[in-house]
Amino acid sequence: MSFDKSKIKNVVFIMLDTLQFNYLGCYGNETVKTPHLDRFARQSVLFENAYSEGVPTVPVRRALMTGRFTLPYGGWQPLGSDDTTITDILWGRNMQTALIYDTAPMRLAKFGYSRGFDYVDFCPGQELDHTTFENEPLDPALKPEDFTSATMVWDENGEYIDDESPQLLDEIGCFLRQQQHRRTEADSYVAKVMNRTDSWLRERRDKNRPFFLWIDSFDPHEPWDPPSVWKGEPCPYDPEYEGNPIMLAPWVPVEGRITERECEHIRALYMEKITDVDRWVGRTLDSIREQGLMDETMVVIMSDHGQPMGEAEHGHGIMRKSRPWPYEELVHVPLMMHIPGVEGGQRISSFVQNVDVTATIMDVLDLLDTEDGISDHGMKTFGAEDYQGESLLPMMQGEVDKIRDYAIAGYYGMSWSIITDEYSYVHWLVSEDEKNNADCVEGADKVMSEDMWTCTAGAKIEVPQHNELYDRRKDPFQLNNIAEENPEKAEELLQKLKLVIGELRTT
């Protein structure tokens, strides 16, 4: 089957939140079982160096929906009234659009990330949607302290260690209240999202019209509550563990608070949850195949970011996104694309950013070069003329080897980084001196609050004192800072980073 844009009618975009790239078999992990995603990778194009330019959850969605960088402009904030989204462009073009999701940050008051979709189906109860179940009485048999480690909560005198302790128990209590009626594996959040997706594909959509479907699963984001936790069984990836299942841990550095054995168990639960997500995504892919849609549908599967979970390469000493640190385990993401007529089984090593995904979708739909205008009915229409991404189609078709020489990543107002074939460089912005040196974007009026960069009270704005340089070939997970030994290379990359950020500020 040769590539022909006119034969591609539909797009299915699947976002899996907090899925670390190297926890997938197709990205080299030999422990985690992900057969469905691995099969999809073999039949699709896999991108080995995809990076989220501005993290975490919300700025990634904004970049993907608008085709424009969020770094360095803004962070955790609503869609702007002047943002042109994919659905804005598709409006009036005889293409039905649907959003099926449980990612509650997209649904925060006035955030507007469901804007423009014809059909919206939200599954309540995930993180930041606690109010849905706040009046639900908790089964007395379910105690929050039974789903974490006591030494993370209380000191030797039986007192709370700090303010993180009651917050952790409250957070676990919220999740228990939401999931206490869970009886089967179909009651998990990812199952609900994928089952509702199947229902829309089979029963609700207009089968005479093309469609754009955005599926957004918050799983495998924490809580780490895979099937074994609810069944009261050992985790298959850690059957010898004898403590409480650790559904959640505090937003803290792990040293002195979370043991390495506990970190191992957390990672095992995370792996099990990924395997569960893989199974349900597999069912959605099977549904697409069974309905004969795969030969006329572009399918994208990716994540917004990974997850720090321990020391060294597992998280640089932190748990969850408790610090604004743009290291490899967080900003390097999995990305796979199936495009009918494009050779499957390819692995592309060129750098890719979120905005390139959006540009590719528009290119496949033959809308990348469209401009704002007026329809035949006198209504304003929108185009992709302001996109900052590059289509990946030329690489996938073998016309070019790469579209970028580097990638950028970071947290709004706190950290920037640049990644090249040989090096990665991290520049910290928090101190006033560093802000001045880097000509940092202030933009206080363009973000909800710097304290809300994860929208979690436990997160702290703490960064290292010095910029960092890493040899990607010898040290891919950025454990040995060589900036002092290589000041010229560090300065070269800093200047390159400042130039890139400066160019983004003016476009």
Locations of the language-model features?
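Catalytic domains that recognize anionic headgroups
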Residues: 1-507
